[in-house]
């Protein structure tokens, strides 16, 4: 284990033999990576491991979860962990210590010699890695997972200042992304959001993707579901499910209020977060304490069965740029009831695989959930349609597209360097 920024254990990649096909080399920079629990961290880990499984040489540079820097290989991915400190705004996120990071990134780029750098955030690691890559003529691909609204509750921005803070945050994001050779977001809605905020460069929607083998519908009937529920500690009742962080931005309180308005439907919440105690109090206040099940953190191996335990999926968030958890639910054959906000409508075919509801209306949410669970034929048909729609988001397709993006960016950078070309900004 390395204790310095230099990560001396990582040697420069060998040059391929004459006539051999060289493996793609990519250096992914991110300010959040497992064990962090959030969509960006989850996507980045799946991207890195998926690319490695397809034969790429993948390096990830990110903050250390322990504070001290180190280098390790996991799942075929070399992780370069930077010295970090607590973010103070959320107990699951640590920040890289700025001192010494640029020099470390310079040395890392010189050793790895990537075909492309792929940044997942515009914060410290992503920003500094992009600058270091540009200084060496290495092309930068950037994927945006950010909305200012997702940070406001953590950094406690007063409500009157939020519009001003949001404008500043969007400007700062655009300043970093504008220097990338290729910019992606998970959905067309997320791409339009960047354009609406004044970003003038092309933005390509590339789905986060879903592993359709890992997440699949229940293979068996009611008896199989009962056994799964018993194993996971879920009562055998009609179940609406949410998987994710129990934080304010996810608006889980809306789900609790909605289930209290239903006739005997239970809500299963899989995940942890700062608002769990508040949600437990709310469940008691609205008379649904016996119908809200808190599973807490669910081990990776058990997650597919958690989806198979449910009858319907519900999500109330209004700042989702895609929602990997909703894709997992769809791949698992669950109907979807989702807030009509941001990118969630892209995952709902009204009356086909589920329903949208007006955000902030627990009554409307409850009515749609009951409509699904009251008719088993409708529920099964909607679940089958969800699975069909999820197949449009195959993880392998997303990985293949990113591989092509890296090759295109690398070829373009080489041609530009040869012609002495310069890149324009925002």
What are the residue ranges of the model-derived segments?
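A conserved mid-protein helix/loop that constitutes part of the nucleotide-sugar donor-binding site
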Residues: 42, 238-261, 274-280, 363
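Conserved acidic donor-binding segment of nucleotide-sugar-dependent glycosyltransferases
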Residues: 350-351, 355-362, 371-377
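Aromatic "clamp/platform" in nucleotide-sugar-dependent glycosyltransferases that forms part
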Residues: 318
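N-terminal subdomain of nucleotide-sugar transferases
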Residues: 1-83, 407, 423-426
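Short alpha-helical donor nucleotide-sugar binding micro-motif in glycosyltransferases
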Residues: 109, 176-177, 297-298, 305-310
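A short, well-ordered alpha-helix in the C-terminal region of glycosyltransferases
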Residues: 371, 378-392
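Short hydrophobic beta-strand element within catalytic cores of glycosyltransferases
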Residues: 335-339, 348
């Amino acid at each position: 284990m390395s204790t310095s920024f230099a990560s001396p254990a990582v040697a420069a990649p060998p040059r391929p033999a004459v006539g051999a096909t060289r493996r793609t080399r990519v250096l992914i920079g991110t300010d959040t990576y497992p064990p962090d629990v959030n969509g960006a961290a989850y996507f980045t880990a799946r991207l890195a491991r998926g690319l490695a499984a397809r034969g790429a040489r993948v390096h990830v540079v990110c903050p250390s979860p322990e504070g001290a820097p180190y280098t390790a290989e996991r799942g075929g991915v070399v992780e370069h962990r930077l010295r970090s400190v607590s973010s103070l705004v959320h107990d699951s996120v640590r920040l890289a210590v700025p001192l010494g990071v640029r020099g470390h990134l310079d040395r890392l780029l010189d050793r790895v010699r990537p075909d492309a750098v792929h940044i997942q955030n515009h914060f410290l690691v992503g920003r500094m890695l992009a600058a270091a890559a540009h200084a060496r003529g290495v092309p930068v691909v950037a994927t945006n997972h950010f909305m200012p609204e997702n940070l406001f509750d953590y950094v406690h921005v007063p409500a009157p200042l939020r519009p001003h803070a949001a404008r500043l945050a969007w400007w700062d994001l655009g300043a970093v992304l504008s220097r990338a050779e290729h910019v992606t977001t998970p959905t067309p809605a997320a791409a339009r959001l960047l354009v609406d905020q004044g970003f003038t460069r092309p933005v390509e929607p590339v789905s986060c993707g879903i592993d359709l083998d890992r997440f699949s519908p229940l293979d068996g009937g009611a008896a199989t579901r009962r056994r799964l529920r018993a194993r996971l500690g879920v009562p055998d009742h009609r179940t609406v499910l949410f998987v994710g962080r129990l934080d304010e931005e996810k608006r889980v309180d809306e789900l609790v209020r909605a289930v209290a308005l239903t006739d005997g439907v239970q809500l299963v919440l899989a995940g942890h977060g700062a608002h769990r105690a508040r949600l437990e109090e709310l469940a008691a206040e609205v008379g649904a304490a016996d119908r809200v099940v808190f599973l807490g953190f669910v081990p990776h191996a058990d997650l597919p069965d958690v989806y198979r335990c449910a009858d319907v999926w519900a999500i109330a968030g209004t700042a989702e740029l895609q929602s990997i958890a909703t894709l997992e639910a769809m791949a698992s054959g669950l109907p979807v009831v989702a807030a009509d906000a941001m990118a969630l409508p892209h995952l709902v075919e009204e009356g086909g695989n589920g329903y949208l509801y007006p955000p902030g209306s627990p009554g409307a949410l409850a009515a749609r959930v009951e409509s699904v669970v009251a008719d088993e034929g409708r529920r099964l048909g909607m679940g089958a349609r969800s699975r069909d729609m999820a197949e449009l988001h195959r993880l392998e397709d997303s990985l293949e597209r990113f591989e092509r993006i890296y090759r295109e960016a690398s070829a373009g950078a080489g041609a530009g360097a040869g012609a002495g070309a310069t890149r324009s900004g925002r």
